[in-house]
Amino acid sequence: MRLVVCLVFLAPFALVCHGQVYKGGYTRPIPRPPPFVRPLPGGPIGPYNGCPVSCRGISFSQARSCCSRLGRCCHVGKGYSG
């Protein structure tokens, strides 16, 4: 009987305390900023995007990354599209 009385008394208190965590401004850990993007070979960096201005001299993986992230895709003999 005492256990039931204790649980009935403590349950609302626990819910109120648990709710205060969220009302008190608890936030997740702040994510780290992305590492500094170094210039890729083949030309200067385009503004704020991390992809070279020219398709020359970049690896296949770099070209694929620019294409999938930013829609700037290299085409043979044509350079970037998009």
Swiss-Prot record:
It is found in: Cytoplasmic granule. GO terms for cellular component: cytoplasm. Coiled coil: none annotated. It comes from Penaeus vannamei. Residues 1-19 form the signal peptide. Keywords: Amidation, Antibiotic, Antimicrobial, Chitin-binding, Disulfide bond, Fungicide, Pyrrolidone carboxylic acid, Signal. This is Penaeidin-3e. One of its GO terms (molecular function) is chitin binding. One of its GO terms (biological process) is defense response to fungus. The modification Pyrrolidone carboxylic acid is found at Q20. It holds the Pfam family Penaeidin. Antibacterial and antifungal activity. Presents chitin-binding activity. The modification Serine amide is found at S81.
